[in-house]
């Protein structure tokens, strides 16, 4: 894509996948705070002029390539695998089929294995259902949902994000992008009283709070570069790597030039649940750890390492 044909991403949202903020927000003060944070994000989306809400959900795991929801009117009733006692989640989502099919084509052009999902009754995952029910309850804005491939590593995930940028630029659509993922994902393996919910361990809480500092400072690319360390420290090894920051950085732009805001951070059955927003800033690229440009055309070095040197 040419430099003049950049996608317009209004802001990004990072939110947790578990159903408590949707189904039982009053069971715990923390769940209520997460629900209030979702509601604030919903308000911001409603006040924006977004054309599409794009969801990358870590609870929609794929094995063969990358799947893209393309059914124009996705209607079903979902029950969460773990928290089925909280009740059913009936949903009806308006999917941007034009975007979905173009996203498949652009993913394949970049060398990825991709396919659309377009049939009645396909089981949309908990994280996507929770996010879209809370962020876009009236289907005011069409959405599209992308899977998270269990085996993809950094390069493949980055390319997926760039395929998103290709598609948004190609169609001229303004987007709000949503990553659905826990921070730490260790959960209690027995029933707990929701009123006594807490982060699974002190180590998990310490790492979560450091990650939140980075998000609050808008340091998205720094988090992307640290993803393997994060995965090794606070993530159950269910998949190859912790991918949300890779995808979000590749989609929004691989730099630290964002205004970050942590709206809520609470425990969800032991895991770290946070609602965060990242808005592209209008200032300079900055001077944070990985503040090199994501170069498409070479025009000489920026000499960032010379900053602050004595004459």
Label each PLM-derived region with a short phrase.
Residues 162-170, 175:
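Non-transmembrane, aqueous-exposed alpha-helical and coiled segments at domain scale
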Residues 180-192:
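A structural signal for small-residue-enriched, beta-sheet-centric alpha/beta enzyme cores
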Residues 51-57, 173-183:
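Beta-strand elements within well-structured catalytic alpha/beta cores of enzymes
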Residues 1-51, 62-159, 190-311:
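Flexible, D/E/H-enriched segments
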